[in-house]
Amino acid sequence: IFWAGIIATFMFLYSITAYNVNNTKNKTVATVALPVNNKVIVIDAGHGVPDEGAQSSNGTTEAESNLKIALKVQNLLEQSGATVILTRSDENAIYDLDSNTLKQKKISDIHNRVKIGNESSADIFVSIHLNKIPQQQYWGWQTFYKQESPEGQKLATCIQNSLNQTIQKQNDRVPLKIDNVYIIKHVEIPISIVECGFLSNPEEEQLLLAD
């Protein structure tokens, strides 16, 4: 069921020509009329060795889970006729070889991700991440978009609503705008960060581990 929801979401991820966003008092509803055929989509699996990102109490790392999601989404999108550009395709971050310290590698890595997005001529950029907080009860997807980016807001709204309607019907979150994350500030095409759940929630961790 979990991966079926991802299939339904990303196979109808974005449409340039048939996209309506309707705002009500408390909800934003997006509808997409066309599939992803002939679209170019950057899928960014956040983090990567040596930066593992968040880690569950059982040792599941954000970097590993992000890549797993990215590869599955790549396969589904390509089967639907999209062209997918991955920022990374293995466990390693994409820092320059002359980076020595962890800080240098993380800075180089994020700069290279931005460069890939801005040189890709892609339609959209989707950055995949996972949450972790001390409390275990919190769960669910959350999407983010660049402040002052109407197209980014449309993208984030489409993803959030599709995920809510398909696999998390009790999730009432709406997309949030942020302006303090480097990648979302500097990627010039429509971009959304998708936090795909909580590694601190045991049930969501098991869903992420499932094939």
Q: Which residues make up each language-model segment?
A:
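Catalytic-site microenvironment of enzymes
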Residues: 1-211
